[in-house]
A protein has these predicted regions:
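Hydrophobic alpha-helical membrane segments
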Residues: 2-278
């Protein structure tokens, strides 16, 4: 049951005010967690930037390096190649499994903290860890099933894949909001689809806010999606009327359209220059 002061009671369809209000509540209730997530974002940004610079500086030049690499490869014994490939595959599988476990724990803990922040509760590391441990396998398999659905729909048709990705971005909040006694994996997908029905544009709106804000966009999206899920769940449980979808939720479409026009304009200018130079 939601508290009298629960923000979920006041349905807010504006993705900007919803997300930043949720971020404010997050900082007020769990400042340490907010700093930790910001640190994760900074680390990821620096890692990506460093990787990009390394890729640029380490590009091989000339055909001689390609031919010498080809000759060296031909001189290697086939048994050594098989061994190296086998070890590489095993290591890759280990990294995938370990990465999946770590990602599940982080997703579960962050989602749990956001859910509790929306209720004005402070959460310790121990509480978040144990809450995630109790729901780990349900969260792990539910997320895996969601990724398979997103991948499958994207292969068939891009738009359904995007729709699935938007919907299942709220899945961790649902699982971490429910009792640890709940075990259904498919059931979590069914519940989420019912709760989010007709409001996917709001999920798109929050994702747009997160995408266009530099550096802190990740934590803004994390808080915004948590707040959106809770008000969707509250309105569904209490059968309250949801307001009209705010026009700012469509801002992402406008930005995508402008980007396409800009790319088209640049290509047109380039073609005109090429044709004129002939």
């Amino acid at each position: 049951m939601a508290k009298a002061t629960d923000p979920a009671k006041q349905y807010n369809s504006n993705p900007f005010t919803l997300s930043f209000s949720a971020l404010e509540r997050f900082f007020k209730s769990n400042l340490v967690w907010a700093i930790i997530i910001l640190a994760f974002g900074l680390f990821g940004f620096l890692f990506q930037a460093t990787g990009s610079m390394a890729d640029t500086s380490d590009k091989p030049s000339g055909s001689s390096s390609v031919s010498s690499s080809h000759d060296a490869f031909n001189n290697i014994d086939s048994g050594v190649i098989i061994t190296v490939v086998t070890v590489a595959v095993v290591l890759m599988l280990i990294f995938i499994v370990v990465g999946g476990v770590i990602q599940t724990f982080l997703t579960g803990m962050f989602s749990y903290v956001i859910n509790q922040s929306e209720q004005g509760r402070s959460v310790s590391l121990s509480e978040a860890f144990h809450a995630t441990t109790k729901r780990f396998w349900r969260l792990f398999w539910a997320n895996l099933l969601a990724q398979l659905k997103i991948f499958g729909w994207t292969l068939l048709l891009i738009i359904p894949g995007i729709v699935a990705a938007l919907r299942y971005s709220l899945l961790p909040y649902l699982i971490m909001n429910e009792s640890e006694k709940e075990k259904g994996v498919v059931d979590s997908h069914t519940k989420l689809k019912t709760v989010v029905k007709g409001r996917l544009w709001e999920v798109f709106g929050v994702s747009t806010v997160a995408a266009i804000i530099p550096f802190i966009g990740g934590i803004v999206g994390l808080a915004g999606r948590g707040a959106l899920y809770r008000q969707l769940q509250y309105s569904y449980d209490h059968k309250t009327k949801r307001p009209k979808i705010h026009w700012l939720n469509y801002l992402g479409l406008v930005l995508i359209g402008l980007l396409i026009l800009l790319i088209g304009f640049i290509i047109s200018i380039a073609l005109a220059v090429i044709i004129a130079s002939r």
